[in-house]
Amino acid sequence: SSQLVAAPLDGAPEGTNVIGIYTWLKSNGSFTILNVDEEGNEINYGKGDVVASTPAETVALAAGGTPFTVAEDGLYYVAMNKADNQLTIIPATFGIIGDATPLQWNGETAMQASYNETQATVEYTISDVTLDKKEMKFRYSGDWGLEFPYQGGKVKLHTNMGYNGDNASAISEAFSECKGGGANFQVGKAGVYTVTLKLDLRTGQFSAKAVCTAEDTSSATLPEKMFVNGDAWGWPQDWST
């Protein structure tokens, strides 16, 4: 079992009662939501009536209801709205976005997902991608956030990962911690990269790195003048001239 924690919401008022977890789900399995009340009583919740179908399905939780399933193996964010006793299951297929990336800020360049059950990690990787010396983030869902029902209105989940700090920071060849809605990553030099976003399923921590495999030298500064030297012209004694 995995414990749900406070959801990374965008601009939600204090006291918003939504918890959730990023987790890898398999299409050949199922799951329920186990709730333990203050007296230690356990209730298993399954699928009840559908509350909303877009942009992701939200359902009412039903005690003893049908277990939840997904159509495809993959990473999902499971959000539980405790105020209304509802559940939303959101596919989280990450890509890279930003003016450093091929699609600029217009869309996500797809990454390839892999799940390591032994190490309990999920990695999204893209290889041989050309990045400019600009900025980037990681994003899914085609938008910066995804809204789902809450108390007659909506709340928005951050669907982008950035640097775990207040200001933009360079992405390096060592993993740096990320957070939902975090600051942009800065690409230090233009070139061809292998970029990885990793999730540790045991801690819920995302981290990212970018390894340059070929530096772009097309914009390198060249000298304004060059000279030929040798026997035909005489060898100067002062090589600084």
Locations of the language-model features?
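Insoluble glucan recognition modules
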Residues: 1-241
